[in-house]
């Protein structure tokens, strides 16, 4: 798997809608070859790196601990056309605190009618889309249920931060 490299802009061209038994996908292309950041690590809990410049909308969001996450309504921030992310309604259906499941901590369901109409639910390319609940970052999308494309798994933001710290420490050691 790709472990390091440049981060470049991407633009979405179309959506292959997910249906029962066949996952959908966001289809796009790299917008240009200009690096906007560097990927340092690619592991089970996500990809980690840094941006050369902060994004235009750089409003800080508090990170929730896994014990602050509740079943119920939440929002996903994802891009399904062009390059502009939007918020969509989801439901956190269940929470799994088992340490053996680093990236399958929550079962989520897309409830937003617009997102369901356009994508059929969770599609390939949505992995990493942030999940917010009560104004805090609680996690990110990781998997789609192939036979129920409106549902999938998500990881706790707390688990992602732990790997970010570990990844940063490893890269600091390599650079030294």
Region annotations inferred by a language model:
Residues 1-176:
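C-terminal recognition in membrane/secretory proteostasis and scaffolding
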